Amino acid sequence: MCTVIQGFGPFGDFPVNPSELLVRSLAERGDPDLRTEVLPVSLGRTAAEVPRLMEKYRPRVWLGVGLAAGRTALSLEAVAVNLAGWPEAQADADGVSVTRRPVAPGGPAAHLTTLPAGPILQAWREAGIPGYLSQTAGSYLCNFSFYTAAQAASALGLPCLVGFLHVPLLPELVTDPARQPSMAMALQAAGLDCVLEACRAASPAGPGGVYR
């Protein structure tokens, strides 16, 4: 069973999305067990592609990666909520804005991550990489893709590790260093490697599909 790493392309004021760079750098390794996908920041295409890719690959691990401008560290998302909404000023790549609506009508209120959060956080601490467990993935496409992936894995009955990692801005994207925190690409990549290693070491799913 493979590992899928899904990032996003540019959006809004960010002509470069570090999640895309991270995912493409993983693709260059030529790991036969790794599948990398970069999606546009698009509601419609994310809604269509995430379930399609989940069914196509039927992975053991699904990790989404996205940019969270303003955050000071890597943030492993604890939960995806069944809520999508963003204003016209933050319209997606197709010009779509959303007034509060469910990600999946009739779906559960939330999906908890099944990534091994404890080992990931410990690996970050040991490597000196700033990171924490976040309690909100927002209500934009990052949360949308996280929830959609978890919902798709559940519908397919897959004992799949599903989760999402938010990364800060890259230093070269910062226009006001005093107000905009950032993290170097090398440190982000090292943090992502910690996540992947912890997932590979996780034991098979226990009751409820949660990996130990």
Language-model region placement:
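A short pocket-lining beta-strand/turn micro-motif at the edge of beta-sheets
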Residues: 159-163
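An accessory alpha-helical subdomain
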Residues: 166-172
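N-terminal catalytic or cofactor-binding beta/alpha core of small enzyme domains
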Residues: 1-139, 150-157, 180-212
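Short acidic, glycine/proline-rich loop/turn micro-motifs
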Residues: 175-178
